[in-house]
């Protein structure tokens, strides 16, 4: 089976029992809650990617970042003959609450943005049915049971309906 590699940088912002998530619009995690973040642009450092992606997907500016760590997951969509090895660098972030929130790009269809906006998800409401593997990995970490070994999803179901917010 072919294995494709994907590397991304993602923000973990956890406040008052809620995790900052985005509503994904495309890809294997579409219509699920995902972490703000994504791929590096040419010549971009990790923290530059982090702050740019958070701004693009949530409209927030990052005030500080800390606790860098790396995890990986393997995702094979159902009925696909390839698997994605998704390597993720995570940073804990604090948002700049005094800065005005920037308007999120509405150019989702042109590929500039794959987020419909942000939502604060109660950690107890995050499930495999409504969240990406990245969010699920962070949930275990936040609950005090971090899974350091690879996690595999061998029959990942892509959602074709939007998630329901509580």
Task: Enumerate the predicted regions with their spans.
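Generic short beta-strand segments
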Residues: 68-74
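Nudix hydrolase/Nudix homology domain
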Residues: 108-166
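Conserved Nudix-box catalytic region and its N-terminal flanking loop in Nudix hydrolases
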Residues: 18-56
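A generic structural signal for short beta-strands and their flanking turns/coil linkers
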Residues: 29-31, 36, 63, 69, ...
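Conserved N-terminal beta-strand and adjoining loop/helix that marks the start
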Residues: 1-19, 41, 65, 88-92
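Unchanged
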Residues: 40-63, 74-131
